[in-house]
Amino acid sequence: MTEDRFDDRGLLARLRQLEDVEAIRRLKAAYCAGCDDDHDGDAVAALFAPDGVWHDTRIAPCEGHAAIKAHFGAIRVSGRIARSSHMVTNPVIDVDGDTATGRWSLLMQYTDPADRRWRIVGFYRDTYERYEGIWRFRRLEAYVQDYSCLHADGA
């Protein structure tokens, strides 16, 4: 085969990119798991670069591990979001060396203290960096497009 993409260097570069994309998918899955584990601030913050930013675009951003932990800890203590389920789909991930970008569709459901079920529809725009050899969030931005109560009577 004469195409460059099939020579050893081309194959190794393509394999590296596929491995990077898979590592980023797993990073996002770990983020969702941390959120769904009663908003475990330690677990979520550990997924970010030390000065990484978590930002729900409806509120002020949280910069750095301490701010991210505090934000998620406040959600946990308040009990305002229980039994959450973050479902992300349709990822578009572009890797460029030790940095990458990603866009994900989001569907989240949760229950509030009055046992009402809520649904959030939106998307994430993320930037990632390879930090000490491991993919981490540089910036995670959540954009909410719809926020609605599914069952106001708790049924």
Regions found by a protein language model. Name each.
Residues T2-L12, V77-A155:
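A beta-strand edge to alpha-helix "cap/lid" segment located at domain peripheries
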Residues M1-G34, G41-D42, A46:
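Short, low-complexity N-terminal intrinsically disordered segments enriched in polar/charged residues
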Residues C32-C35, C62, C149:
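Generic recognition of cysteine residues
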